[in-house]
């Protein structure tokens, strides 16, 4: 499958170390660094997941005209992902999330980022480049990966979504708060529970599936969403398309780190939807894939062979 990915570029940076003493300067641990590592995050991680699953991703994003932007592009190239759709902006910095980890536990996370919307010039560049790609490639699905860092604007989404609808290409969205209500007329909308409740402005009990169903159905109809997919972390997922609204529990497993699980879920769900799989299979596959990456520390893509083996064991 060929997939267009649009969204925020992030470098997930890790300092792995050990803590053996407390600082004499303040009551904080001293971490002796053993290893440093950088990985593509955000829309980059979705692209890596897609490639690991056998798809061809075309990523469109904006980075700063800085060393970290060059690093991000190098990480993509090393992962076998084209950087033709990565545009630079000297007025922005490339987003970096730096995590310090000891014995599998996060000590602290430090974010360096720009959150303002991209300018109209970059907006136009991305829209034009995507239009040309759609004219020359058979694209199976378009995924919008929004981390509220400014790449996805209401105008960019609207223009690209119109192109997708006119060509019969399904669209999937992994939203954040800022543009939550801008995403209308999409094929798949995948917030987590916190994003969903904040987005609709209603407090819900995560265990009250009847209330979630009512709120989800109302929102889905209002936004004209074909398939609404809400992840509920340890409780599994809720998925509904109007004809069927159902909760699917999570498989019990050890959780090491939830970072990047949402990227994996939107990747698997989008491919499954584009392949016209049924709602139950989409839910189980995505649920399973998200759980697999939660068993590893840091932002990592799903392993295709491991996913296939687990699916066979679960008779999916």
Region spans (language model):
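Positively charged, low-complexity intrinsically disordered leader regions
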Residues: 1-20
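Substrate-binding N-lobe of the ribokinase-like
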Residues: 3, 24, 28-96, 310-312
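Structural motif
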Residues: 4-6, 109, 140-143, 172, ...
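Active-site metal-binding loops of divalent metal-dependent hydrolases
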Residues: 9, 147, 264
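Conserved phosphate-binding/catalytic loop of the ribokinase/pfkB sugar-kinase fold
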Residues: 86-92, 99-136
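Short acidic, glycine-rich surface-loop motifs adjacent to enzyme active sites
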Residues: 135-151
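Conserved phosphate/ATP/ADP-binding segment of small-molecule kinases
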Residues: 150-245
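Conserved post-catalytic alpha-helical subdomain immediately downstream of the catalytic base
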Residues: 222-226, 251-314
